[in-house]
Amino acid sequence: MSGFLEELLGDKLVTGGGEEVDVHSLGARGIALLGLYFGCSLSAPCAQLSASLAAFYGRLRGDAAAGPGAGAGAGAAAEPEPRHRLEIVFVSSDQDQRQWQDFVRDMPWLALPYKEKHRKLKLWNKYRVSNIPSLIFLDATTGKVVCRNGLLVIRDDPEGLEFPWGPKPFREVIAGPLLRNNGQSLESSSLEGSHVGVYFSAHWCPPCRSLTRVLVESYRKIKEAGQEFEIIFVSADRSEESFKQYFSEMPWLAVPYTDEARRSRLNRLYGIQGIPTLIVLDPQGEVITRQGRVEVLNDEDCREFPWHPKPVLELSDSNAVQLNEGPCLVLFVDSEDDGESEAAKQLIQPIAEKIIAKYKAKEEEAPLLFFVAGEDDMTDSLRDYTNLPEAAPLLTILDMSARAKYVMDVEEITPAIVETFVNDFLAEKLKPEPI
């Protein structure tokens, strides 16, 4: 177990009091679950979370005192046998060391050392963290993600009765009545044999309302084509009145607004960090894509439904948002040449498929997304923003969160060059240039 933890966290962590702790010792203590707490001292929501998380942490570990100073920083000799084998590690985005020190001082758990900035960025990218505070629970033995939305765990299970909060099958989580906007109620068993879109949305969110208008047409086209497809609206509205107003525009099903527990469990199951989000499931309840929003906007006629992920995407206005989700390989080409974009996709597809398959076997998300970019206004803006040369073809890896780029500017790009470039990046052999 300690091998995984050391690979993830490095050799040393620190307590709130500044004492170093060997990561290897976590394995010896039999930690079953690791919580990664992504936050920042300047964030008011993070300050609020730290207080409630300290009480939660103390209760689950069975510490004599659940407040600041108990637990990790209190000394191993005096620490009681934990009721639940849980450890939390704070991963900060602070830019000022003094502010970081003041913030972690009262934390009863451990923290990644301030100087480990590169490792912090790797963790943010690895787990696709898009906002703070964020709390992700991992199996400390296998490294597999157990729960992406630990904030809801704290709210929904403050006593830790459902520990270790592992994912449950969709059919189990969705079980219960579903509504149509005419008041008709259907059992969730009516979904059997259908592809399902789980739609997290709210009326107060303008991008949600825009997507809903498009999604209504997509839903109609898919149904008219004879496909077995249903959408379930999981509301994030702030009142039942707002929910009813918004739901009146939707021809599909919804989890009742009053069933807050089921709505929360669905958010936990899919680790929802923002809306709108459309998760598309196969008839067995397995995730086909988490990028339903992008797929619907890119495929107006729904010809590619149910939108199985493509190893290489053609960069567009609707999927450019994915550039912010982690490192992306982008091959810029001269799209004025007939067939250039398709040839470029075929060029990088083998290595993309190889990387995706490798990480899928480990039940992890691939560490890179793969794009081909032609010539249009959006691509020009991307080149300008990242200060890239106008050359084509141009092979790059862009890491927006780290504000870093890696450029392979050669006359001819071959599959071997692409594979070497990707492998060197993953092995951290490439020197980044600032964006």
UniProtKB/Swiss-Prot annotation:
Main subcellular location of this protein, as a coarse class: cytoplasm
Domain of life, per lineage: Eukaryota
Record-level GO cellular component terms: cytosol; nucleus
Biological process, per Gene Ontology: cell differentiation; circulatory system development; in utero embryonic development; negative regulation of protein ubiquitination; negative regulation of Wnt signaling pathway; Wnt signaling pathway
GO molecular function terms attached to this record: thioredoxin-disulfide reductase (NADPH) activity
This protein's UniProt keywords: Acetylation, Cytoplasm, Developmental protein, Differentiation, NAD, Nucleus, Oxidoreductase, Wnt signaling pathway
Phenotype of null mutants: Perinatal lethality, possibly due abnormal cardiovascular development. Osteoblasts show an aberrant activation of the Wnt signaling pathway.
UniProt key word Oxidoreductase: yes
The keyword NADP is assigned to this record: no
Sites bearing N-acetylserine, chain numbering: 2
Catalysed reactions listed for this entry: [protein]-dithiol + NAD(+) = [protein]-disulfide + NADH + H(+); [protein]-dithiol + NADP(+) = [protein]-disulfide + NADPH + H(+)
Domain Thioredoxin: 167-314
UniProt xrefs under Pfam families: Thioredoxin_6, Thioredoxin_8
Catalytic class of the enzyme: oxidoreductase
Phenotype when changing residue 208 to S: Loss of function and interaction with DVL1
Matches recorded under InterPro entries: NRX_PDI_b, Thioredoxin-like_fold, Thioredoxin-like_sf, Thioredoxin_domain, TryX_NRX_thioredoxin_dom
Subcellular location as annotated: Cytoplasm, Cytosol; Nucleus
UniProt tissue specificity: Widely expressed with higher expression in testis and skin.
Stored Gene3D superfamilies: Glutaredoxin
Subunit structure: Associates with the phosphatase 2A holoenzyme. Interacts with PPP2CA; the interaction is direct. Interacts with DVL1 (via PDZ domain); the interaction is direct and regulated by oxidative stress.
UniProt xrefs under PANTHER family: NUCLEOREDOXIN
Protein purpose: Functions as a redox-dependent negative regulator of the Wnt signaling pathway, possibly by preventing ubiquitination of DVL3 by the BCR(KLHL12) complex. May also function as a transcriptional regulator act as a regulator of protein phosphatase 2A (PP2A).
The protein's name in its UniProt record: Nucleoredoxin
Lineage: Eukaryota, Metazoa, Chordata, Craniata, Vertebrata
